Amino acid sequence: MKNSIFIIVLLLVHMATFAQEGVNFEDLTFDEALAKAKAENKFVFVDCYTSWCGPCKYMAQAVFPQKSMGDFFNPRFVSVKFDMERGEGKELNEKFGVKAYPTFLILRPDGTLQHKIVGGTGMIEMFIEKVERGLNEKTSLDYLDKKYEKGKLNKKELVRY
C-alpha cells in the first residue's frame, strides 16, 4: 500500500514538473501583462483564440506545452491568452484587427504591435522561426508595414510581407 501511494505521488510530481516546462501562460489582464513586461524588460505574447477553433486547441495541447517552446518563450515574453469572443478578448480583437484563429501577437511593453502571426503549426521550429522574425526589428510586421507605406519594400521583403 505504501509503495502504491509513493508511486502515485511520484507520478503526480513528475506530471506537474512536465506541465511547467512549456510556455508559461499567465492569468493576467492586458494591462497587467503590459506592466509586467515593462518591469521585466520583455515583450508580450498574446494567444488570440476562440473556444471552437480546432487549430487553437491543437496549439494549446500539443505545441505550447513542449519544453523547447518554454525554453524559447519564457525568458523573452510575458505570455497571455484571450478568448477573442469573450470579456477583454473582444476589445483586443477589435484593437488589433484579429480576423482568423489562432492569431498570435507580439507586443512591445507599451502595447504597440511589433508582429502578428496568423495560423498555427505543429512544427515547433517553424513556429519559433516566425516568432524570431517578429522579434527582429528589420523583419517584423511593424517594420514591413512602415516600409510598405513608404513604397520601399524590395521583392524579398514584399514576399515576406
Spell out what each predicted region is.
Residues 1-22:
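Bacterial Sec-dependent N-terminal signal peptides
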Residues 20-40:
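N-terminal leader/targeting and pre-domain segments
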Residues 22-28, 48-50, 62-89, 98, ...:
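Thiol-based oxidoreductase modules, predominantly thioredoxin-like and allied folds used
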Residues 40-51:
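Short active-site neighborhood of thiol/selenol oxidoreductases, capturing the structured segment around
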Residues 53-56:
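Short cysteine clusters
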Residues 98-140:
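Non-catalytic, surface beta->alpha helical segment in thiol-disulfide oxidoreductase systems
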Residues 125-161:
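Charged, amphipathic alpha-helical linkers/stalks
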